[in-house]
């Protein structure tokens, strides 16, 4: 009897051990998922752009030098251009920048363009009279033309707006400096009896510049972007050209006196509207 009870206890213990082991086998461990690495957004980038500058109107003024003998020799009057325009043309640019996050980036850019300049002014009444023309009629004018090379060095900042698929719209602004260099200015006096043709040395100068930008970039790859945008560039005014050889002479047909020196004309600056396309490569 006692022996039978002992065997029964052993069997119950064995069954309990097997049941506990089976229950342990049924416990399923929860999988641990490591977070996926996020793409690095911060880093340097390079950019290159080509664009087209639309024709723009500006203004300017020039001094009329009286060649008569002393005490009448000198600047007789100052005239505003009736028309002063910068023709359209291509522009080219390169830059290096840094992206801080998915919204903010900055860059330094260097751009270049070259454009024709045209100016027109009516002749003063006393010049018309000297040609035997009616001084109150529109019968005499000056035509000026030259070319200008413009380099801009700008520091820019951009805010990238929320993405729409592969497209990222953006807004930007920049400040910097513009180097403006004029070629020789050619002036023609236009009227039935006019013969004046003169060349004047173009001036060069550094000027303040500012820009506003808007556009959209398209992801060609994770690192290469196609950039389509618009830029408004304001370049401050400065010296345009000096006096011609006759005005600079100390001795002329009217006698002897001081010759003209320094700038004869100044422009009012340029408001340049540009559409641009470029590539931006981001290092990550």
UniProtKB/Swiss-Prot annotation:
Disulfide bonds: none annotated. Keywords: Signal. The keyword Membrane does not apply. It comes from the Bacteria. Transmembrane segments: none annotated. Residues 1-23 form the signal peptide. SUPFAM superfamilies: OMPA-like. The keyword Signal applies. Belongs to the surface antigen msp4 family. This is Uncharacterized protein BMEII0376.
């Amino acid at each position: 009897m006692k022996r039978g009870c002992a065997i029964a206890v052993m069997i119950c213990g064995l069954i309990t051990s097997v049941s506990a082991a089976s229950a342990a086998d049924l416990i399923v461990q929860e999988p641990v998922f490591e977070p996926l690495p996020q793409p690095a957004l911060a880093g340097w980038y390079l950019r290159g752009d080509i664009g087209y500058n639309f024709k723009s109107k500006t203004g300017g003024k020039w001094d009329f030098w009286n060649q008569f003998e002393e005490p009448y020799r000198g600047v007789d009057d100052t005239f505003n251009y009736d028309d002063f325009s910068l023709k359209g043309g291509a522009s080219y640019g390169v830059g290096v920048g840094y992206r801080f996050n998915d919204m903010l980036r900055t860059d330094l850019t260097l751009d270049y363009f070259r454009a024709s300049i045209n100016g027109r002014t009516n002749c003063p009444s006393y010049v018309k009279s000297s040609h035997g023309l009616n001084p109150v009629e529109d019968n005499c004018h000056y035509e000026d033309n030259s070319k200008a090379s413009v380099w801009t060095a700008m520091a820019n900042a951009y805010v990238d707006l929320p993405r729409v698929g592969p497209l990222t719209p953006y807004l930007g602004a920049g400040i910097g400096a513009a180097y403006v260099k004029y070629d020789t200015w050619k002036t023609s006096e236009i009227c039935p009896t006019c013969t004046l043709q003169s060349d004047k040395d173009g001036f060069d100068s550094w000027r303040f510049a500012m820009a506003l930008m808007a556009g959209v970039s398209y992801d060609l790859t994770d690192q290469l972007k196609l950039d389509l945008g618009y830029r408004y560039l304001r370049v401050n005014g400065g010296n345009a050209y000096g006096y011609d050889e006759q005005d600079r002479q100390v001795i002329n047909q009217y006698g002897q006196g001081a010759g003209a020196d320094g700038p004869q004309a100044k422009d009012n600056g340029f408001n340049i509207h540009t559409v641009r396309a470029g590539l931006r490569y981001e290092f990550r």
